[in-house]
């Protein structure tokens, strides 16, 4: 039995819990605790009802200082200092740190000092962590000795399997990526102050360029592409699902059919459950609650002069990533 604790019960933290239960309940994983500074009543309410993902089809209620999900009692804490949490007493194997705030080795060591066996960040971390994992691409590097791991980002999990597949088939020279991301909690409902002047503007009224470290994150997973990719990102007025526009140049001459068939083969083979492929005339909302890391829209693949390839891919930046958090947790524990 893998005992996990969730530190930070926001969009990803709640989706991790929902994904664990909705997937038929992996009997080998149990959530034993949640640490969140919000009111317990609000935590229960947002577990039961979700604007993006609908109602949670398991009974949830408060039970003293715990949350009862079905027959499972999950201890609730509101502690700012992770080193003071009772991870040792609870026998926590892995802390899923979903705060979006912590991200260094020193941050993770606070959980380890409290008695946790390992820590998995739900976001890109500093370079001093033991490993950064994109499940399906490099989770095999886990040896069991890693105690502090990052699950990268939702966009890295979306684009890296595609880049790795196409590089293996056609030898990529370089590329650019545009992320078209749904609005996030760090944006404003109406114009208000923010250190990023673009994010002072109302999220529902504009397409908003934001900074992204996606290219650096990609290099950490695929170091042979250091300096070969650049990325930009915009936020759009939707609440979930992200599109990614990938352009690459390749050494081998290719056609649209070549590219699409390579991705279809990968989706049926080594990347089954991670990568999906469609040619249906779908829009972003159709990918809401899709557990894949990436869904290729084959109708949008373009090739210019046999070497310049452009394609469109989708991901549910919440649900898909939450499922990868669970996959990486299993891989960390299976490695030893």
Curated annotation (Swiss-Prot):
Q: Which Gene3D superfamilies match?
A: Dihydrodipicolinate Reductase, domain 2, NAD(P)-binding Rossmann-like Domain
Q: Where in the cell is it found?
A: Cytoplasm
What UniProt keywords are attached to this protein's entry? Cytoplasm, NAD, Oxidoreductase, Pyridoxine biosynthesis
Q: Which reaction does it catalyse?
A: D-erythrose 4-phosphate + NAD(+) + H2O = 4-phospho-D-erythronate + NADH + 2 H(+)
What Gene Ontology molecular-function terms does this entry list?
erythrose-4-phosphate dehydrogenase activity; NAD binding
The record ties this protein, via CDD domains, to:
GAPDH_C_E4PDH, GAPDH_N_E4PDH
Q: Which GO terms describe its cellular component?
A: cytoplasm
Q: Quick one: signal sequence residues? A: none
Q: What is its EC number?
A: 1.2.1.72
SMART domains registered for this protein in UniProt: Gp_dh_N
Pathway(s) of this molecule: Cofactor biosynthesis; pyridoxine 5'-phosphate biosynthesis; pyridoxine 5'-phosphate from D-erythrose 4-phosphate: step 1/5
- Where is substrate bound in this sequence? 153-155, 199, 212-213, 235
How it assembles, according to the record, is:
Homotetramer.
Give the protein family: Belongs to the glyceraldehyde-3-phosphate dehydrogenase family. Epd subfamily.
Identification of the protein by name: D-erythrose-4-phosphate dehydrogenase
Query: What gene, per UniProt, encodes this protein?
Result: epd
């Amino acid at each position: 039995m893998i005992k996990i604790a969730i530190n930070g019960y926001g969009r990803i933290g709640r989706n991790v819990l929902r994904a664990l239960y909705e997937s038929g309940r992996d009997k080998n994983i149990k959530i034993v605790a949640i640490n969140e500074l919000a009111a317990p009543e609000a935590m229960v309410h947002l577990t039961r009802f979700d604007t993006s993902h609908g109602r949670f089809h398991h009974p949830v209620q408060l039970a003293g200082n715990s949350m009862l999900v079905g027959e499972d009692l999950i201890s609730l804490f509101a502690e700012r200092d992770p080193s003071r949490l009772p991870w040792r007493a609870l026998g926590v194997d892995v802390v899923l740190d979903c705060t979006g705030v912590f991200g260094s080795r020193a941050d993770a060591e606070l959980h380890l000092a409290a008695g946790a066996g390992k820590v998995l960040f739900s976001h890109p971390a500093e370079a001093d962590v033991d490993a950064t994992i994109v499940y399906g691409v490099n989770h095999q590097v886990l040896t069991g000795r890693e105690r502090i791991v990052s699950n990268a980002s939702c966009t890295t999990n979306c684009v890296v399997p595609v880049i790795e597949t196409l590089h293996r088939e056609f030898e990529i020279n370089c590329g650019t990526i545009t992320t078209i991301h749904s609005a996030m909690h760090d944006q404003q409902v109406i114009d208000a102050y923010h250190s990023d002047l673009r994010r002072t503007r109302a999220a529902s009224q504009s397409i908003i360029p934001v900074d992204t470290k996606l290219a650096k994150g990609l290099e950490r997973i695929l170091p042979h592409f250091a300096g070969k990719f650049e990325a930009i990102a915009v936020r759009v007025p939707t609440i979930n699902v992200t599109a990614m526009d990938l352009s690459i140049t390749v050494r081998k001459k290719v056609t649209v059919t070549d590219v699409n068939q390579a991705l279809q083969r990968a989706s049926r083979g080594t990347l089954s459950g991670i990568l999906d492929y469609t040619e249906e005339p779908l829009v972003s909302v159709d990918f809401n609650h899709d557990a894949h890391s990436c869904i290729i829209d084959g109708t949008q693949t373009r090739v210019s002069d046999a070497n310049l390839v452009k394609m469109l891919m989708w991901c549910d930046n919440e649900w898909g990533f939450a499922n990868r958090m669970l996959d990486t947790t299993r891989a960390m524990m299976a490695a030893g």
